[in-house]
Amino acid sequence: MAEKIDLKPSAPWYRLNTTDEDWQNAEAADLLKWYSQMKLIRRFEEKILDFEKAGLVHGPAHASIGQEAAAVGAMSVLKTDDQINGTHRAHHQVLTKLINAQTPSDFDILQSDFTDGMHDAVYRLMAEIMGLNTGYCGGRGGSMHMRDAASGIAGTSAIVGGNIPHAAGYALADKILNRKGISVAFFGDGPSLQGATYEAMNIAALYRLPVIFYVENNLYAVSTHIQDATRETRIASRCPMLGFTGIECDGMDILSVHQAMREACRIIEEEGGPVVIEAQCYRYLHQSGSKSGSDFGYRTREEEEEWKSRDPIALAERRLKELGIAGDAEFLKIDERVTAAVQAAGERLTETAAGSNVLRIPDALWPSASSVDDGILGDGSEFSGAEFREIEDYQPDELEKMRFAAAASDVLGRAMEKDPTIIVIGEDVHRFAGGVSGFTRNALELFPDRVLAMPIAENGFTGVVLGAALRGLRPVVEIMFGDFCFVAADQIANGISKVRHMFGDGFPVPIVMRVRVSPHTGYGSQHSGDPSALFGMFPGWRVVSPTNAFDYIGLMNSALKSDDPVAVIEHVEFY
């Protein structure tokens, strides 16, 4: 009879629970700060829902009521220059990160009103969610696309799971550029089952990237319970099979989340990343708007009431009372101050017509229709002063005969010598003395550490490339066959093409995507396609297709200088 041998994963997976001693040892000032931030989120979201009912929110209102501790506890450990992103439900994460960036180190909410910077953060986020021009993205992003680079908010994404590879890319850039920092991708139980999530986690583990994959497991993807979506509902269980740590915590307990986040940062500092945190929490309301899930019949009022009995704000109040840190008078004072900040923001964003008490948006706050195309492409100012020459500008004795593939290798190697931010990513780029087409031959000889092999995960590593570009690298990503662009189509179309436009412009997206087109090679229809039309469908891309070595050198040099994403379509018949 065959012998059965139990196998164990190479990485741990565990749950962190807080104790009474943990609460006693926590700093009183920290607990009060975290409590006030949870209260701010609650009042902020209530105001957004009021405005949504009044027809004043231009777009959805994905409220985070019930999930306040999951956000505040996570942000309590992060620094301003640590990077975060999120999904469609990110008001609570973004608001906390913004407030932390503006809160003085000695601020005491029981003694002081909000500073001007704190007020401005509340106001500008509310404006953005309402689609108004004083928002962080000029109203372009709205509720689901929020960004403020100065506060470490790299951008939220409405494509479920689309943001997760980006965070791995931020971390990759930090690692290559020798910057200290943590990147965090926030997402829910729904995105945890996306293929892009698995791909990003695997790449992050492969390169030990300093990134935390933070899952707010609120049990529901719109109306679908996690039990209806996966047999293994414990999301952090996925980590050990990829070789990194998974931590589970009580997402309704502010201190439990803080400790899990602190533990994750310690692991990254001492052992390398990534880490997954699964914060088990609950969204009190429906997917969007102010109704409950039970109003739509996909869960019961009894279930909702059971979770509300563990309200994170009420739990914190009970602990603060038990510890003698605060009582009803202090809670009232905190509530008054955060409510005043929210109310002040709302008053700046609305008005009433003469003789009416119906709120409306002042005309001056609507974005200008003339700005609708801003950010689709850059203005090309990065080419100011650049010299462009055609082959006719050279004498015959100034030119050298060269194969197309050799020119490709040479131009990349020379560019990498001049620019330390250029990296190469793709499948097999580190083998065959230059990858499958010889493109990386010189790069491997000169800068082998900047040529990064990727698994067969085009959508995942294309998303990583986008994150890396947003954090200061100029990545060159290779798609081995043009047909594989359709595997990466989400990141090509919804990610790279739209990222600058949906956040209101103002930053570069320096990506070069090399695409090999290989007809007439006998590989059949799935390896012979030309995807140029795919890029043409999405105007955030520039597309070039050189046919000789001279044009390749010039166009690749331009692509590597461009602040727009450039697709370089290479027909192997010219190699």
Model-found features: residue ranges?
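Conserved acidic/glycine
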Residues: 1-70, 76, 285-287, 291-447
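Cofactor-binding active-site loop characterized by glycine-rich and histidine/acidic residues
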Residues: 46-49, 54-207, 225-231, 236-243, ...
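Active-site nucleophile and cofactor-binding loops and adjacent substrate-binding regions
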Residues: 58-67, 88-89, 146-164, 188, ...
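Glycine-rich loop at the start of a catalytic domain that most often binds anionic cofactors/ligands
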Residues: 64, 72-79, 96-105, 435-447, ...
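Short acidic, glycine/serine/threonine-rich loops at helix termini
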Residues: 75, 95-100, 158, 195-199, ...
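General beta-strand structural signal in soluble alpha/beta enzymes
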Residues: 84-87, 137-139, 168, 185, ...
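A glycine-rich helix N-cap at a beta->alpha junction
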Residues: 109-114, 118-134, 205-215, 451-453, ...
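Glycine-rich ThDP/TPP pyrophosphate-binding loop and its adjacent helix/strand module
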Residues: 152-343, 351, 536-575
